[in-house]
Every structure is written in structure tokens, then in C-alpha cells.
A protein has these predicted regions:
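Structural beta-alpha unit
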Residues: 1, 41, 79-118, 123-125, ...
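Small/aliphatic-rich secondary-structure junction motif
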Residues: 1-59, 162-230, 252, 282
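Gly/Ser-rich helix-loop-strand patches that form or flank binding pockets
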Residues: 4, 27-28, 103-160, 249-292
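Short, well-ordered alpha-helical microsegments
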Residues: 15-16, 103, 176-177, 239-241, ...
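Aromatic/hydrophobic pocket-lining residues that form π-stacking "cages" and hydrophobic walls in ligand
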Residues: 22, 77, 106-107, 183, ...
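Hydrophobic anchor at the start of a short beta-strand
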Residues: 34, 88-94, 153, 195, ...
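A short acidic, glycine-rich active-site loop
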Residues: 56-72
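N-terminal membrane-insertion helices
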Residues: 70-78, 212, 216
């Protein structure tokens, strides 16, 4: 089944790490549909200039108006996808002025478009790249605690050559199992990547054998073969630090974590969001997949 991704693009055409990640991660990008999304800031200096024009994408499927910088960024994004052998007709472009704030706008678009993932960039200096123009901690908390978050979010720093495979964090929760399901679905035809189910022991006394068994069953529904699945545990007081250290040591391309759904208490959601926020500040080399 083709995957459908929403990729954010800003005026900063020199930094398109979200595009760089998907171009390096997927073996057959032509199986996927990519929507390039640009949201103009209401106070952007060139919003009122006469040089704004309708985007005429390769497939004629674009909507909205563009600033000069956004046009350059989208042109570069198209060129990157072409070099990755993605058919141009499988690309859609959208652009519009900020409506309810960029966090809410991107979540609304992600929900309405029924995307499999929303893909953002991230600077190694711990700032979410160009898109939100806020600190990583503030943006992560805004996203994670927002009740409209229904679509997995990928936060992607500049990819490092040679990285591969996905580390999926499991703790027995429904949120973690949703992360397992998301990874299995995304990697169902990407057999160049293995999946490692990872649990951080912290004295809670959870049944890891049962936890891994249930996660493996989910992966098998996506036709992930047994030889592509690994299980690992580690001990650590700081869950986020332990996850990040393991991902760095074994050079994973991505780390997937689950978020509790809206039926969980706000306190649980905020606490789990704190772990995710901490991971965001540590994602210098691997992408972070946050699954609601």
C-alpha cells in the first residue's frame, strides 16, 4: 500500500532536512505520495509584496500563494525528490497563510488529509528547523498536548550517512503498541531496515517477555519477517537519556515512541510529553517518530 506523507517546507531553502531524511531512508520512494506544505507567517516581510504568485507545481496540484523564499524552497524540494527517482506526478504542493497558528494549522492539515505521517525538520542546535520558529521544548509540548494530534509526527535532523534501522520503544502501554503498529506499517516493504523493540528497565517490574510477544504479533500482521525483528532491554534512571544513548551507539536512523491517546488523563499525556521533549533535544543524528 502506498504511504502518504505531509512534508513541511519553509522559506529557508538551504535547510530541508525532512526531505533529506525521507530521500535517504526509503528504498522505493516512488511508492509514496508526498505533499509539500508551506505556511506563510502572518508577519512575513514579503507577504505583501507584489511578487507573490500561485504555485504551479509539476502536477498542477498546488494551492495558495508563495513568497520568493518559499518558491525557491519548493523548487529545491522538487529537485531533491526527482533525484530520488520519485515520479513527479506523485507530488502535491500546498501553501497558505497562517490561520490559527502554525502548530494548529499543520495538525489540522495532517488530520484532514489522512496522512500516514507529518514530517518536520530539526536543526542540530535543538531548534525545530524553520517551520515553527520556536524553541524545541515549547513546540514539542504544544504538539503533544494538543487534542487534535491524531497523526504521527516525525522530527528529522540532518541525516548521517550510513544510518539505518528503527528503534521502537515499548513499555506495555497502548501508546507504545500504536508506535509498533506505525513502524510495522511504514517498513512493511522496506526490508533494508530491521526493527528493534527496546525497553528501558527502571524497577517497575514489567513483564518484558509478554510485552515483546505482543509487539511482535503486531509487526507480523504487517508481514515483517522474524529475522528483521530484534528485542533489547537496558537499565536507566533517565528513560530519554537511555534511549538516546542506545540509538546513538548502534546508529539507528529513527526512534519511535508512543504517546497516550486523548482518552488518557492530561497528567499522563504531559508526563509522557516530557520524555518526548527530552528526546527532541537529543535527536542530533536520528529522527524521532512520535505516535499518538
Amino acid at each position: 500500500m502506498n504511504k502518504k506523507f505531509l512534508v513541511t517546507v519553509s522559506d529557508d531553502y538551504a535547510n530541508l532536512t525532512s526531505l533529506e531524511f525521507i530521500c535517504s531512508f526509503f528504498k522505493q520512494l516512488s511508492e509514496h505520495q508526498i505533499t509539500l506544505l508551506h505556511i506563510s507567517r502572518l508577519d512575513a516581510a514579503d507577504m505583501n509584496k507584489a511578487l507573490m504568485k500561485m504555485w504551479e507545481g509539476p502536477d498542477g496540484g498546488g494551492t495558495g500563494k508563495l513568497t520568493i523564499g518559499a518558491r525557491k524552497a519548493l523548487d529545491k524540494a522538487v529537485a531533491m525528490l526527482k533525484s530520488s527517482e520519485m515520479a513527479v506526478e506523485q507530488m502535491i504542493t500546498k501553501t497558505f497563510a497562517e490561520r490559527y497558528g502554525k502548530v494548529k494549522d499543520i495538525l489540522n492539515e495532517g488530520s484532514e488529509g489522512l496522512y500516514d505521517a507529518i514530517i518536520l525538520g530539526k536543526r542540530a542546535s535543538y531548534t525545530l528547523q524553520w517551520f515553527f520558529e520556536r524553541s524545541a521544548d515549547e513546540t514539542a509540548q504544544s504538539i503533544i498536548q494538543d487534542s487534535s494530534l491524531k497523526t504521527p509526527i516525525w522530527i528529522c535532523p540532518e541525516p548521517e550517512a550510513g544510518r539505518k534501522n528503527v528503534l521502537v520503544c515499548v513499555d506495555g502501554s497502548r501508546g507504545a503498541l500504536r508506535a509498533v503498529d506505525h513502524v510495522g506499517y511504514i517498513l512493511s516493504r522496506q526490508d533494508q531496515h530491521t526493527i528493534t523493540l527496546f525497553h528501558v528497565e527502571n524497577g517497575a517490574g514489567l513483564n518484558t517477555e509478554e510485552m515483546f510477544r505482543e509487539a511482535k504479533q503486531i509487526l507480523q500482521t504487517h508481514e515483517i519477517s522474524e529475522d528483521r525483528i530484534k528485542t533489547e532491554t537496558d537499565w536507566g534512571i533517565s528513560v530519554a537519556a537511555t534511549i538516546a544513548a542506545y540509538a546513538q551507539k548502534y546508529r539507528f536512523a529513527a526512534v519511535a515512541v508512543g504517546l497516550e491517546g486523548s482518552d488518557q488523563s492530561l497528567l499522563k499525556r504531559i508526563n509522557l510529553g516530557g520524555i518526548t521533549t527530552s528526546l527532541i533535544t537529543r535527536t542530533e543524528k536520528f529522527s524521532l517518530w512520535c505516535c499518538p
